[in-house]
């Protein structure tokens, strides 16, 4: 197992450097002068223009810019925002709990209902429920997030008034941000009703963000269950007279979860990409909205290093999933 982990760690280093190079190149491939883009329509004095280029290090050769960039990363220096003058790392840590809370709620929604729908669809193969799950999952996977979010807002927030339209908490509550996780902070506070209000604010964004992962998990679970149910050990378990529930949940589902676990890891990238739109639609103060606001303000350091941090997070999560996959499937550990 240690050699398996070492091999996976060995792949992290070139992957990370590839991400830094890609991030560095993409920012510099944007058309136009970065300083003029950041200044917008304001006229820029040549001296101020030169000072801005020097401050950003953009007056150096590209290779030197990249070496400086990697050197600053090695020192933990991600620069500071051009608009707030706060450190990029500080802003990321401040806003990350909001995105993590939303992502965990979305994965809880997707995992619970996706696994349940996939298992039942496999057990009732060819039934109306099975066809319904396949159709709905295909629609959920194909549905644009922004359109789905607006539909739910119109229905549950505007028409029925069941859920709030935006934000994480009603302005009536004044909660001290101890952890950054609103559900935890409201539980720790003395303000009655704040926790339920935080849950109401979380429901719609979590459903919107979790719809695509739910569709993928449901289809993958159904496919994996159908394959496992045809295995000899499942037939043997049935022949021994084991209860249907024990056959399904102990013998079949446990083995079917191995490929589903991989899908969970792959959905992290989907969640972070979807969070950009979801947080913008619901004015959710997380990493996605932070990056969108930085792009609109032409905040060069935030865009560059924010994208790098998100990409690094995806790499680390996939690394953890690889390790869990190796623990669940010994054959993977011994592959060279």
Curated annotation (Swiss-Prot):
One GO term (biological process): protein transport
UniProt entry tagged with the keyword Flavoprotein: no
Gene3D superfamilies linked: MetI-like
Location(s), subcellular: Cell inner membrane
Membrane-crossing segments per the record: 10-30, 102-122, 145-165, 198-218, 257-277, 307-327
UniProt domain ABC transmembrane type-1: residue ranges: 96-325
Key words, A-Z: Cell inner membrane, Cell membrane, Membrane, Peptide transport, Protein transport, Transmembrane, Transmembrane helix, Transport
CDD domains: TM_PBP2
Topology with respect to the bilayer: Multi-pass membrane protein
Observed effect of gene inactivation: Deletion of the dppBCDF operon leads to reduced ability to utilize di/tripeptides as nitrogen source.
InterPro entries cross-referenced by the UniProt entry: BPD_transp_1_N (IPR045621), MetI-like (IPR000515), MetI-like_sf (IPR035906)
Superkingdom to which the source organism belongs: Bacteria
Any single GO CC term annotated in Swiss-Prot or TrEMBL for this entry: plasma membrane
Predominant cellular place of this UniProt entry's protein: membrane
GO molecular function: dipeptide transmembrane transporter activity
Role according to the record: Part of the ABC transporter DppABCDF involved in the uptake of various di/tripeptides. Is also involved in the uptake of phaseolotoxin, a toxic tripeptide inhibiting the enzyme ornithine carbamoyltransferase. Responsible for the translocation of the substrate across the membrane.
Subunit structure: The complex is composed of two ATP-binding proteins (DppD and DppF), two transmembrane proteins (DppB and DppC) and a solute-binding protein (DppA1-A5). Five orthologous SBPs (DppA1-A5) are present in P.aeruginosa, which increases the substrate specificity of the DppBCDF transporter.
UniProt record similarity statement: Belongs to the binding-protein-dependent transport system permease family. OppBC subfamily.
Name under which the protein is recorded: Di/tripeptide transport system permease protein DppB
Species of the source: Pseudomonas aeruginosa (strain UCBPP-PA14)
High-level lineage: Bacteria, Pseudomonadati, Pseudomonadota, Gammaproteobacteria, Pseudomonadales
Gene (UniProt): dppB
């Amino acid at each position: 197992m240690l050699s398996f982990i070492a091999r996976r760690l060995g792949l992290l280093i070139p992957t990370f450097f590839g991400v830094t190079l890609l991030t560095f190149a993409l920012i510099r491939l944007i058309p136009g002068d970065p300083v003029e883009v950041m200044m917008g329509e304001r006229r820029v004095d040549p001296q101020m223009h030169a000072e801005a280029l020097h401050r950003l290090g953009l007056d150096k050769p590209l290779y030197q810019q990249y070496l400086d960039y990697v050197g600053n990363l090695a020192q933990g220096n991600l620069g500071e925002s051009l608009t707030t003058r706060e450190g990029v790392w500080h802003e990321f840590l401040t806003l990350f709990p909001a995105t993590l809370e939303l992502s965990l709620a979305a994965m809880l929604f997707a995992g619970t209902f996706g696994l349940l729908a996939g298992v039942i669809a496999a057990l009732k193969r060819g039934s109306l429920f099975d066809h319904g799950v396949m159709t709905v999952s295909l629609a959920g996977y194909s549905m644009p997030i922004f359109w789905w979010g607006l539909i739910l807002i119109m229905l549950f927030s505007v028409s029925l008034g069941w859920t709030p339209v935006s934000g994480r908490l009603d302005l009536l509550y004044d909660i001290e941000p101890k952890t950054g996780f609103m559900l935890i902070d409201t539980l720790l506070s003395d303000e009655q009703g704040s926790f339920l209000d935080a849950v109401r604010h979380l429901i719609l964004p979590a459903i919107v963000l979790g719809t695509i992962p739910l569709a993928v998990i449901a289809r993958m679970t159904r496919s994996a269950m159908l394959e496992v149910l045809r295995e000899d050990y499942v037939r043997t378990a049935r022949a021994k007279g084991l209860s249907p529930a024990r056959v399904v949940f102990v013998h079949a589902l446990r083995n079917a979860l191995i490929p589903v676990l991989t899908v969970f890891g792959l959905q992290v990238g989907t969640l972070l990409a979807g969070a950009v739109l979801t947080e913008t639609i619901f004015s959710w103060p997380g990493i996605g909205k932070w990056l969108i606001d930085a792009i609109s303000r032409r905040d060069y350091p935030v865009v560059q290093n924010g994208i790098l941090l998100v990409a690094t997070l995806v790499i680390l999560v996939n690394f953890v999933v690889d390790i869990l996959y190796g623990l669940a499937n010994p054959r993977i550990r011994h592959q060279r």
